[in-house]
Amino acid sequence: MGIARILSAVLFLSVLFVVTFPTLLSADHHDGRIDTCRLPSDRGRCKASFERWYFNGTTCTKFVYGGYGGNDNRFPTEKACTKRCAKA
């Protein structure tokens, strides 16, 4: 591998790091993953009717989950939602 290729690879990786690093430090991330508590409620794609809880930005709120799909802002109980999302 020539020196020009090595320098090009180093430059590319440096630019990639500079572009993505601020995103990793943003307020929407928690421990390296998107904070589930900021996601909107999502009923999912099926037509079942399961009582679930999501965090609406202030409190945990009940909603009807369809049973498949949706996102991670979905908890089986209000207590589980509050434990994960309520700020002390």
UniProtKB/Swiss-Prot annotation:
GO terms for cellular component: extracellular region. GO terms for molecular function: potassium channel regulator activity; serine-type endopeptidase inhibitor activity; toxin activity. The keyword Disulfide bond applies. Disulfide bonds join 37-85, 60-81. It comes from the Eukaryota. PROSITE patterns: BPTI_KUNITZ_2. GO terms for biological process: envenomation resulting in negative regulation of voltage-gated potassium channel activity in another organism. Residues 37-85 form the BPTI/Kunitz inhibitor domain. It holds the Pfam family Kunitz_BPTI. The keyword Signal applies. Residues 28-33 form a propeptide. Residues 1-27 form the signal peptide. The record marks 47-48 as: Reactive bond for trypsin. It is found in: Secreted. Expressed by the venom gland. Keywords: Disulfide bond, Protease inhibitor, Secreted, Serine protease inhibitor, Signal. Serine protease inhibitor that inhibits trypsin at a molar ratio of 1:1. Belongs to the venom Kunitz-type family. 01 (intermediate) subfamily. This is Kunitz-type U15-theraphotoxin-Hhn1l. It comes from Cyriopagopus hainanus. The lineage of its organism: Eukaryota, Metazoa, Ecdysozoa, Arthropoda, Chelicerata.
